[in-house]
């Protein structure tokens, strides 16, 4: 018998109950190593003074700005954060890497309890030097839809299994956009027929669909790659006007 998704009303009730068991999203389970430096927009957030201490991902959307999840810096002072660009192996000092402190951060009404507006802009201490290993990614149009069935790519440096150590090199995973159990503020993904998905330790990383960042790793329900529930990403297209307005405002302040 074919699987039938729950009705929208029932799905909303079930999701509200399940959110109490939601956990920060993070690692890539069931993926594979990315080709070195093939995702030049990928950022690693680390603890300052502790090289290799990756705790969240991010995405370079402008030479001076990285997009990540708001919950990544909820309990960490920004002065303790080191942003690393151009990395493939986060445990080594690669010649392609560029390191930055955080100049300031911008939130958009983050609601931690309901896991809404899980988006944060980091202004880097100085503009990145763009190269083959460090490049920006394209933003979607405001409110651009991502249809059910769209094929996308999730990535990160988190654990590759619930009981495995964090990955040293960037991992990526092909995922499918789904609508069951999802909410309007999120994009949800699923990997059919096998145990794979995002998990703990690498929130903030991007969901890339057709070369465009459409999502930010946000949370999972009842553990990693359960094959029962989709993975939840912040829907970037809802925040494009806010992102562009913030960038314009910061750039205007910097003009003489």
From Swiss-Prot:
TM stretches of this protein: none
Q: Does the keyword Cell membrane apply?
A: yes
Protein's cellular compartments: Cytoplasmic granule; Secreted; Cell membrane; Membrane raft
The disulfide bridges present are 56-72, 152-209, 182-188, 199-224
Q: Which residues form the Peptidase S1 domain?
A: 28-248
Task: List the EC numbers from the record.
Answer: 3.4.21.76
| Induction trigger | Induced during CSF3/G-CSF-mediated neutrophil differentiation.
Q: What SUPFAM superfamilies does the entry give?
A: Trypsin-like serine proteases (SSF50494)
Q: What is this protein called?
A: Myeloblastin
Which organism's genome codes for this protein?
Answer: Homo sapiens (Human)
